[in-house]
């Protein structure tokens, strides 16, 4: 069995905890992917994980495949400046005005790690604020009350993070203006930065109040700290200008990843020119990497952005998410379950609970066991949902109306089986 072999060479048998699917007898094994579909050892599945949001056009999109193939024919790494990376960065800058300059790295984790280091170097301060349930990758600065796989596995604060590092990270309830303002005023002139998911997509999906986002900007400006928007998930998914465009708030620094790599490894941190000019070689804040601005990732990312600029991919993906959100609530209600679905743009998540979901505590109060049972039944009927209530579902331009209706029919069967299992 492949999983047994995998456990012999990988911790837990996987290379990222979210792939373990701890509620199943064994993880899914991928065989391939195309359009909205994953091909696995359990058959073809309609994919709503979409590589945790990295894929927005659909799997193996022809335009992306062609761009990557052409780049491979020219060579795949030079460790030199290229015309393509400049054109790519100019495209991003045109759509995200807060990013005046940027550094292209290799992952969301690298992006947020460097953004925090840069904020500390620029302000000459050490303390940062992050929010309960926000996930900013797997580095020491931010692995405190984190989301995503850390929440799924019940280890939001990782072992191995020194207490001296934790002491420099203040954790505040998400979407709580009063708690945030109080904490900023307590820290005052020691605060280097506030890092936040402007739409929290790593603790389920939590859409904050506009007043909360506005307060982040006002309070950081008041004390001379930097505001970092972690848009690794939302960048170029919520729209060409991301969540900051949706809320109309301009952060000092932004991190990007996922969509802008077209399914290949990438991360970006960028923002105000005066802040970014602190990055080596123009300044004293160090960042370097053999694979920075990798030509293949840049080629894929540029192809994705050019497709998104046409508008139609967003229209299809967003309409799919809207239809699924409404359809799932209706199906769950007919089956006798209290379910609320949160949705924005091409992201959605469902929770087994009554009432709204506005905070991480609301997510924790949802019935995780029911979600995991539904997830397993959905696979049985050909649908792959996000593997935990602490993750988010994503649609793509390949999730056409027919695919959505097929999905809803499959989920109706899954909810009917769930009802019989739990005795409703």
From Swiss-Prot:
N6-(pyridoxal phosphate)lysine: residues bearing it: 258
| Key words of the record | Cytoplasm, Isomerase, Porphyrin biosynthesis, Pyridoxal phosphate
Does Transferase appear among the keywords?
no
| Gene3D superfamilies (UniProt xref) | Aspartate Aminotransferase, domain 1, Type I PLP-dependent aspartate aminotransferase-like (Major domain)
Q: Which PROSITE patterns match?
A: AA_TRANSFER_CLASS_3
The pathway this protein participates in, as annotated, is: Porphyrin-containing compound metabolism; protoporphyrin-IX biosynthesis; 5-aminolevulinate from L-glutamyl-tRNA(Glu): step 2/2
- Give the NCBIfam families listed for this entry: hemL, PRK00062.1
Name-wise, this protein is: Glutamate-1-semialdehyde 2,1-aminomutase
């Amino acid at each position: 069995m492949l999983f047994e072999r995998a456990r012999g060479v990988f911790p837990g048998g996987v290379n990222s905890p979210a792939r373990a699917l701890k509620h199943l007898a064994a993880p899914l094994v991928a065989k391939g992917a195309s359009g909205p579909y994953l091909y696995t050892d359990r058959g073809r599945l309609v994919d709503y994980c979409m590589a945790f949001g990295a894929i927005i056009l659909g799997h193996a999109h022809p335009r992306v495949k062609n761009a990557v193939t052409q780049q491979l024919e020219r060579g795949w790494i030079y460790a030199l400046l290229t015309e393509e990376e400049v054109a790519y960065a100019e495209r991003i800058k045109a759509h995200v005005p807060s990013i005046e300059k940027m550094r292209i790295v290799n992952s969301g984790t690298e992006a947020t790690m460097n953004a925090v280091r840069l904020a500390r170097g620029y302000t000459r301060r050490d303390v940062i604020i992050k929010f309960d349930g926000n996930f900013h990758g797997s580095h020491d600065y931010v692995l405190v009350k984190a989301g995503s796989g850390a929440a799924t596995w019940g280890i939001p604060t990782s072992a191995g993070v020194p207490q001296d590092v934790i002491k420099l990270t203040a954790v505040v309830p998400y979407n709580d203006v009063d708690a945030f303002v109080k904490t900023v005023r307590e820290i005052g002139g020691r605060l280097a930065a506030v890092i936040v998911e402007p739409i929290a997509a790593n603790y389920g999906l939590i859409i904050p109040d506009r007043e909360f986002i506005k307060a982040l900007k006002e309070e950081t400006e008041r004390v001379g700290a930097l505001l970092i928007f972690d848009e690794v998930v939302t960048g170029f998914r919520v729209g060409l200008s991301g969540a900051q465009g949706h809320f109309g708030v301009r952060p000092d620094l932004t991190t990007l990843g996922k969509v802008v790599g077209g399914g290949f490894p990438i991360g970006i941190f960028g923002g105000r020119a005066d802040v970014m000019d602190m990055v080596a070689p123009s300044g004293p804040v160090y960042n370097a990497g053999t694979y920075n601005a990798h030509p293949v990732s840049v080629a894929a990312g540029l192809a994705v952005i050019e497709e998104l600029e046409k508008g139609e991919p967003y229209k299809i993906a967003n309409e799919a998410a809207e239809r699924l959100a409404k359809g799932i609530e209706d199906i769950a209600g007919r089956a006798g379950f209290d379910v609320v679905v949160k949705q924005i743009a091409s992201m959605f998540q469902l929770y087994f609970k009554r009432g709204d979901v506005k905070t991480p505590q609301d997510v924790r109060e949802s019935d995780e066991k029911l979600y995991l049972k539904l997830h397993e039944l959905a696979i049985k009927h050909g649908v792959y949902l996000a593997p935990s209530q602490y993750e988010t579902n994503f649609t793509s331009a390949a999730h056409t109306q027919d695919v959505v209706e097929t999905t809803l029919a499959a989920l109706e069967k899954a909810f009917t089986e769930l009802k019989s299992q739990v005795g409703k």
